[in-house]
Amino acid sequence: MTASSRLRFDIEDAPSDADVEVLPNGLEAFNESKWPGHQQWRPLAVFARDGESIVAGLAGETYSGWLFIRYLWVSDALRGRRIGRKLMGDAEARALERGCHSAWVDTFSFQAPGFYPKLGYEVFGELDYPPGHRRIFFRKHLEAKAGAQVYASE
């Protein structure tokens, strides 16, 4: 270990990719030592297409029993037609098939903060970000619907 008296602290506005890459590599090595297999992320996407065009969709990942919804988008022309609800339901069903017990998503106050509670999501955190708005974090415990078959494969 380098003696602390010889450490130099550099503040950089344009760090190299190689220098920045040292950080997640070190963190991942530490995390793996405490939580083996934590990096077993599986992509999950649901798309609504009109012909060859994607007009709505959801993209996220499942890992360690959780579904993370990274993106949910419905084109302006289709909003209000329950397309988002269908995308979320399909993703949650697949997450259950993969053995997930919960889901989480975040949105901004100018996007769809009223949508997720209608689907059973509850707020677990908020940030005053970006200025003049809020970033809101939601979670939900997933439960299989009556009569649905669920296979734990993750």
Which stretches of residues belong to each language-model region?
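Conserved active-site tyrosine of GNAT-family acetyltransferases
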Residues: 23, 116, 121
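Conserved catalytic-core motifs of GNAT/GCN5-like acyltransferases
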Residues: 104-106, 122-139
